[in-house]
Amino acid sequence: MTACLRRTRTLLALTFALAGAWAAAAAAAPLSLRDDSGQTLTLAAPVQRVVSLAPHLAELVFAAGAGDRLVGVMRYSDHPPEALLLPLVGDAFAINLEVVATLKPELLLVWRSGINPRQQQRLATLGLPIYANEISSVDGIADTLRRFGRLFGTEAVADAAALRTELRWRELRARYGRRSPVRVFYQLWHEPLMTANRSHLIHQAIIACGGINVFGGQPGLTPTVSWEAAVAADPQLVVTSGSDNEPARLEAWQRFSQVSAVAAGHLVALPGHRLARMSPAFVDGALALCEAIDRSRH
């Protein structure tokens, strides 16, 4: 064996040894990640047991390839169907801390806007790490997926889901965004009448579809508006969503035949609540909205 060949083999062996050492060190190193509240979370290893305290967070965990790590969810965590089989730990009004504790989670996922200070204080008494999430755009959905991939050690699945979400959103905007504008009223609730302003993800979907959110300029994320104001805005399309548990309620609009949407029969109930969920399913909901807006153009 020549000296040159021996040196080459020695270098290769050293390279592989160093690569293995680096990989082992990376696996053993603590995981440090900043959440959407600005707090840095440090964990010894990828999370194996997690409780989600918002339905969209459960969806994101599944989409990131870590559905098997979920040990507890909130009421209305219904997508994917496997989420319905998990223990319930509460709803939007109350969290059962005793149930949470018995599930022995390593991490709690909370929706920053969906939890009040009193609930935060009570959760802190459990002494568990808390990851606070806040999403205000489709980019935020993709970013959360990637961060969840790091939290759970499922980067390959999570990164692919994030990229797929970004590409689908880009394609939707390119396809529908430049079509003739349609005035849209999105009804979040019927009594009192509630809608979404420009800070809401639903507004972003309306704009991406080539629509105009007639109350986009209102203060508050989900402003309450009067029927007089809604009629005066004269939307060309009225949209809401519904499910078996919460049927769509659009019948009150029939009183106002002078509204363009009513006169044309453009009152649409989208199935499910995909547009209200800050998860990859939001893009599915946005596509259904775009199709409804497109039909109202004819």
Task: Please provide the spans of the model-predicted regions.
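Extracytoplasmic substrate-binding proteins
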Residues: 31-33, 39-40, 106-107, 111, ...
